Amino acid sequence: MTQRESLSVVLITLNAAAQLEPCLQSVGFADEIVVVDSGSSDATLELAARHGARVVQQDWLGFGPQKQFAVGQAANDWVLCLDADERVTPELRAAIASALQAPACGAYRFARRNRFLGRYLRHGEGYPDWNLRLFDRHQARWSDDMVHEHVLAQGAVATLDGDLLHDSAETIAAYLGKQNRYTSLAAEAAFAAGKRASGAKLLLSPLVRFVKFYALRRGFLDGLPGFIHTVIGCFNSFSKYAKMIELQRKETRS
């Protein structure tokens, strides 16, 4: 039998002790685990060491640059990039092992299933949330985006069976606080890139998003959690464009 490609799992962390252990337990099949930490003050580092991870300290660079830095710390060319609140299912683990036996391409994506209000969403924006996370670092890399980062692959991308579970286990207040930070970063990045918002985008973007994810992708089948998840996503669109308009007005006044 052909020996499979060696695999490094890489994570970025900051005070992730509450979620980290299930993640590390799910990737015990990897040849190496690398945790790049940006200054945790909780038990994150102790948990990582307990599971045999190699810990690297790096001040925060932004989501894309931080994840690419983590990829660069891996000992192996094939990397699986995860967040601390994610878990690899047995089905996905088997699919990854099979793919690495004889890789057909340099990058693989798979579905992520998001848990919201204690329920794994099966429709709408919550599933399938396609993520490209397994790749040969010579054939793909993380974008330089400070937020909404994504992997840029040079060639074909294949799809694996099995789900990645996203267990954020947050309160609504914490979730909204995170979304507020993300929309601020997204607005600043779009503005810096020369993009401009308008009243039409401010009004239409949330409506289009609601129709797409709640109606067309049947988010309504996820009950009240699906409705709340969709509405918050729509408000994120509204918030991003509102913040861009604020930046535009500041530019005009200056």
What function would you assign to each model-found segment?
Residues 11, 30-39, 56, 84:
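Short beta-strand/loop segment that forms part of the nucleotide-sugar
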Residues 45-73:
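Conserved donor nucleotide-binding strand/loop of the catalytic core
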Residues 1-26:
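N-proximal low-complexity "stem/linker" segments adjacent to membrane-targeting elements
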Residues 18-21, 42-51, 91-92:
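Acidic helix N-cap motif at the loop->helix transition within catalytic regions
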Residues 30-31, 52, 74-76, 154:
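Short, well-ordered alpha-helix to beta-strand connector turns
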Residues 26, 37-47, 83:
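A conserved acidic beta->alpha catalytic loop
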